[in-house]
Amino acid sequence: MSDTAERVKKIVIEHLGVEESKVTESASFIDDLGADSLDTVELVMAFEEEFGIEIPDDAAEKILTVKDAIDFINQKTAA
């Protein structure tokens, strides 16, 4: 697993209080991990802080799974 994936997973575990085994790349923040809309906003803010990036609202709305977050962050940090 990449460094980005590990960091994203750690943030999700800390913010949502879920078991590490539940945080897979295909896991949906809302459907699988029990996040609500406020949780997803807080996750986006945590990703922005951790990776030093800005995630515009239109992009944040499309980050629905752990993999979506990893892919977006990898794209932003590679640029």
From Swiss-Prot:
GO terms for biological process: lipid A biosynthetic process. It comes from Rhodospirillum centenum (strain ATCC 51521 / SW). InterPro entries: ACP (IPR003231), ACP-like_sf (IPR036736), PKS_PP-bd (IPR020806), PP-bd_ACP (IPR009081), Ppantetheine_attach_site (IPR006162). GO terms for cellular component: cytosol; membrane. 4'-phosphopantetheine is transferred from CoA to a specific serine of apo-ACP by AcpS. This modification is essential for activity because fatty acids are bound in thioester linkage to the sulfhydryl of the prosthetic group. Belongs to the acyl carrier protein (ACP) family. The keyword Ribosomal protein does not apply. Pathway: Lipid metabolism; fatty acid biosynthesis. Residues 2-77 form the Carrier domain. Keywords: Cytoplasm, Fatty acid biosynthesis, Fatty acid metabolism, Lipid biosynthesis, Lipid metabolism, Phosphopantetheine, Phosphoprotein. This is Acyl carrier protein. The gene is acpP. PANTHER family: ACYL CARRIER PROTEIN, CARRIER DOMAIN-CONTAINING PROTEIN. One of its GO terms (molecular function) is acyl binding. It is found in: Cytoplasm. PROSITE patterns: CARRIER (PS50075), PHOSPHOPANTETHEINE (PS00012).
